[in-house]
Structure formats: C-alpha cells, structure tokens
A protein has these predicted regions:
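Coiled-coil dimerization/phosphotransfer module
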Residues: 1-133
Length: 133
C-alpha cells in the first residue's frame, strides 16, 4: 500500500499540481482491504485534480492503535458542501458509503479559497496469518 501511494503521488503530480506523500508504520494488509483503500485514495486524488485548482496536495497514511488514519489535503479553491449539486456529490457519497461498509469514519472540511481536508479512519484488517500446526 505504501508503494502504491508513492506511485500514485508521482504519477498524478504534474506542472500544475505537486502531490506530497508520507506513510508511517504501514505494513501489508488484507488484499481486498488494500484494494478498496487504494481505489478510495485514487478517487479522492482524481477529485482533487478535476475540481480543486490546487497547486499542492498531500497524502498522509498512518497506522496507529489498530487503525489506519488517512488524510488528504489540498490548497485549492475549496467548496461549500451544501452547494454541491447532487450529481457532482455522487462520488463523495459513494466513497462515504464504501468507508462505512469498511466500518470506518469519513469527514470533509472545505473552505472557499483555502482548500479541502479529508480525513478517513479505518479499523486495520491485517493479512491473515496461516497456522499449519
């Protein structure tokens, strides 16, 4: 997962947007869990590229106390969550639903002309250890 985030940050960084990333205490997790989380991060970065007009974004992923904490921030134009048209909010609603299915929490803080901060907290689903005895 840490390598996937590094690749994603490098792949999506361009002349208009620099994506910084940091991972702390990240290990291998259940494969399905990793795929779901990777897809969520990818969708959020795509939203940043598509809507934010940001010049800098950051991805922070930390494992602490059996939880994964994900923070994605940008310095873009921000938005008023109440003013987002239903069709434009579908991606966010789907992400929220996926996170809740993973028994996690999702929050967005966005301010016009300051940027957006997204926080996700998920219980860790570790790779199963096989016991042959």
């Amino acid at each position: 997962l840490a390598y996937a985030i590094k690749d994603m940050a490098e792949k999506y960084s361009n002349s208009q947007l620099e994506i910084l990333y940091e991972t702390q205490n990240i290990q291998r997790y259940d494969q399905d869990f990793e795929i779901k989380l990777h897809n969520i991060i990818q969708e959020l970065i795509n939203n940043t590229l598509k809507h934010s007009e940001a010049t800098t974004a950051s991805i922070l992923l930390v494992e602490k106390d059996e939880k994964l904490l994900l923070s994605i921030k940008d310095n873009g134009k921000g938005f008023d969550k109440l003013q987002v048209p239903k069709k434009d909010g579908l991606g966010i609603n789907q992400i929220d639903a996926r996170i809740h299915m993973m028994k996690g929490e999702f929050s967005i803080d966005s301010k016009n002309n300051i940027g957006t901060s997204i926080t996700i907290e998920l219980p860790v689903l570790k790779k199963e250890t096989l016991n042959f005895f």
